[in-house]
Regions:
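Acetyl-CoA-dependent GNAT
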Residues: 1-46, 57, 63, 118-120
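Short acidic/polar active-site loop segments enriched in Thr and Asp
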Residues: 7, 70, 94
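Conserved GNAT acetyl-CoA-binding A-motif
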Residues: 64-77
């Protein structure tokens, strides 16, 4: 992904221990979605709620905007993941939809929440090709 110009970030503490990581990648491979990215962020369980995830996603947003992308999508694989949903809301994402029982995690069906945030000018203007 990094070789293709997409961001991959790792947060570490002073001792070099991994706290979390995040990345963005193309939302879909079709040309129509070339200005839209999907973010993913993962934070170690014992340090959630301490700002690591927010710092990672904020940096992903900044890098996506610098790349000229116009929309960022978050696909949250469990509607009960209030931490991730709240994190994305705090950074300007809004809920775009819920896919019922679209995922299977830990032996149960989960609803998948899709969230969206405009980047830069968003849909206000056409991007430079």
């Amino acid at each position: 992904m990094a070789a293709a110009g997409f961001a991959w970030l790792v947060a570490v503490d002073e001792a070099g221990q991994v706290l979390g990581y995040g990345y963005f990648a193309p939302f879909r491979e079709r040309s129509a979605y070339r200005f839209t990215a999907e973010d993913s962020v993962y934070v170690r369980d014992d340090i959630r709620g301490q700002g690591v995830g927010k710092a990672l996603v904020a940096e992903l947003i900044a890098r996506a905007e610098a790349k000229g992308l116009r929309q960022m999508i978050a696909v949250i694989g469990d509607s009960e993941n209030v931490g991730s949903i709240g994190l994305h809301i705090s950074l300007g994402f809004r809920q775009a939809g819920v896919l019922k029982a679209a995922g299977m995690k830990f032996g149960r069906w989960v609803d998948v929440v899709t969230m969206q945030r405009a980047l830069g000018e968003g849909e206000k203007t056409l991007p430079a090709e």
